[in-house]
Amino acid sequence: MSHILFLVALSFVCSSCNRTPSVEEPDVLKVELKETPVSVSDFFSKVEVIPLETSDSCLLARILRVRVSGDTTYILTQDYPTFRHITLMAFDKKGNYLRSIGRVGQGPGEYSQVYDAVISEQRNRVYMLSPFGSMYTYRLDGSFIDRKILPQKMNFQEIGLTPDGDLLTWSAQNKDDGACIMRLDADSAKLINEF
């Protein structure tokens, strides 16, 4: 009987003993960052202030994006005081207002909301991205071409151009597979690949 009690006690002691594997501490690299003052002239050879035209048709309230293409500066801006409507305005290199591209509404060529725009001079196009899964295409003169539904309806935030003219869109809401960047054909808005 004492042997049985001894074996039970021994098995209890053995089962309660755990070996924890040794964990090696990772190497810690210490990086010392030195702040170095940088001058604007380190990046630009010339800085020129260009006052933009101010009239009732082209008042800027909150600037969201600035895109420069050729001699034209495109500014994506929200209206004041509601900050609900977003407009893309074009100015020449002297700051003169040229036109607005697209507008808020329910009709053809009108959008409910856009978050970003990109300009392709090679294609004579302006692509405006709606967060609701649509892309609006206009000519550089502001005339409407079409509206395309994007492959997946996601919370689209930004749009850009690749060197070969395809479009890249970024979404804040990842799909289940983690992809949040889509590469699209600029003409058809068909999905090429996603990352």
Question: Model-derived features: where do they sit?
Answer:
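C-terminal motif of bacterial Sec signal peptides marking the signal peptidase cleavage site
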Residues: V13-S16
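Blade/loop signatures of beta-propeller domains
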Residues: P21-P51
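Beta-strand-rich domains and repeat architectures in extracellular enzymes and scaffolds
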Residues: E48-R84
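Blade-loop segments of beta-propeller domains
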Residues: E53-S57, R62, F91, N96-R123
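Residue-level detector of Asp-centered blade-edge/turn motifs that repeat once per structural unit
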Residues: V68-D71, I119-R123, L161-D164
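A short loop-to-beta-strand structural motif that recurs across blades of beta-propeller domains
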Residues: I86-M89, S134-Y136, C180-M182
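Short loop/turn segments that connect beta-strands within beta-propeller blades
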Residues: D92-K94, R139-S143, D185-S188
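Asp-box/WD-like beta-propeller blade repeats and closely related beta-sheet repeat scaffolds
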Residues: Q113, P131-G178
